[in-house]
Regions:
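Generic recognition of stable, solvent-exposed alpha-helical segments in well-folded globular domains
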Residues: 1-4, 36, 102-105, 129, ...
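Radical SAM/AdoMet-radical enzyme domain recognition
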Residues: 3-24, 33-154, 161-162
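Active-site neighborhood of divalent metal-dependent phosphoester/pyrophosphate hydrolases
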Residues: 28-29
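Radical SAM enzyme [4Fe-4S]-AdoMet core and its adjacent flexible, acidic
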Residues: 94-218, 222, 230-239
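Short, basic, glycine/proline-bearing loop/turn elements
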Residues: 55-56, 192, 253-254
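Flexible mid-to-C-terminal extensions adjoining Fe-S/redox cofactors in radical SAM and related proteins
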Residues: 233-354
């Protein structure tokens, strides 16, 4: 992406909406842009969009991180997301030999320069068999854990070779919920935090579980606008271009915008009787639409997994509140009530105190 396009993005966003904006540098590999790009782009965006209180994030494998780049990013308190799938042997089996060492080398540079790095772990049909080893790796190293399930490839002759089946994903989430509760205070599992918050607030808290249309957009290198970063590079999902200064209404009128609205309408119709609809919203539109060539044939295929973990959390909350001992507490001078094992409310309490 050129600096000219960065300026055009800034001008477009100035009047697009009045909400606070978060800008994530994604790829490909965004560090390939180099230090000079960020040295110019970050002031343009932060000053030009000051009225929107912009914050920034970056997603990278960290291979190209240098002390110079790290220092530039640290000036803007940019958190970095990277990918590690567990111990070196498991990670490199999935991502290629040498990946682990290169990423950890970048991680050490980030740490030395005050950058916060959080790792995303992709669980596949193979690595899920080593879930305890992977969990212990994150626990032992003090890494917060965020996970993704491997999806069927759109570019492979054997698309499901590595894909994690929805049923297995649901059981993995329940397993990690249990492991989290066994190790509260020693590790943070971000997905579990988000899922518990969804249930408690009755509203989705991350893009997978909300109506993301119109609020989570991506801009390609040429200024093309997409519904989200996962659609970048797919011409049929271009909604407009920043050079044309489209309004939210303009984007909604595009073919891709109409498809996103059609998915939302489908969810309202097909999921109306689901107890989780308010904080699930049919899951991720990309997961539902991209594998079918743009045809709406169902909701996110991980619906089974989402129902499994949402049911589990709801059942446990109800049990904690109405059918089991409460957390140890003082009640206006009364004796301490019987101590309960840590549960969902402990997770919520931990989040609230941060």
């Amino acid at each position: 992406m050129s600096i000219e396009t960065v300026r055009e993005i800034t001008e477009w966003l100035k009047d697009y909406r009045s909400d606070q904006v978060t800008i994530t540098f994604h790829g490909g590999e965004p560090l390939l842009a180099g230090a000079d790009f960020y040295r110019q782009a970050l002031p343009i965006l932060s000053e030009g969009l000051a009225h929107l209180a912009p914050t920034f994030a970056l997603q990278s494998n960290l291979w190209r991180l240098t002390p110079e780049l790290a220092q530039i990013l640290a000036q803007y308190d940019i958190p970095v997301g990277s990918s590690i799938d567990g111990p070196e042997e498991i990670n490199d089996l999935q991502r290629g030999k040498g990946y682990f060492k290169k990423t950890m080398r970048g991680y050490e540079i980030a740490r030395a320069n005050g950058l916060e790095v959080r790792f995303i772990c992709t669980f596949t049909s193979r690595s899920v068999e080593h879930k305890e080893e992977i969990f212990n790796f994150f626990l032992r190293n003090g890494f917060p854990l965020k996970l993704h399930p491997a999806l069927p490839s759109l570019r492979n002759e054997n698309p499901k070779e590595w894909a994690l089946e929805p049923e297995a994903y649901g059981e993995l989430l329940v397993y990690l919920l249990d492991k989290y509760l066994e190790n509260l205070g020693r590790i943070e599992i971000m997905n579990i935090n988000d899922l518990c918050k969804c249930v408690f607030t009755r509203h989705g808290t991350v893009c997978t579980y909300v109506d993301c249309m119109g609020t989570t957009l991506a801009v390609g290198p040429d200024g093309s606008i997409y519904p989200c970063y996962r659609f970048v590079g797919m011409p049929e999902y271009v909604m407009g271009n920043v050079y044309d200064r489209p309004t939210p209404e303009d984007l909604a009128r595009s073919d891709a915008g109409k498809l996103m609205q059609a998915f939302k309408d489908y969810v309202d119709r097909e999921c109306g009787g689901c107890p989780h609809i308010k904080y699930c919203r049919g899951g991720c539109p990309y997961n539902a639409i991209a594998p079918t060539g743009g045809e709406i044939q169902g909701v996110d295929p991980h619906c089974v997994a989402y129902k499994r973990i949402f049911d589990e959390i709801n059942d446990r909350v109800n049990e904690e509140l109405y059918g089991s001992p409460v957390m140890e507490t003082e009640d206006f001078g009364s004796p301490l009530r019987r101590k309960a094992k840590p549960g969902i409310m402990w997770i919520l309490q931990t989040m609230a105190t941060k």
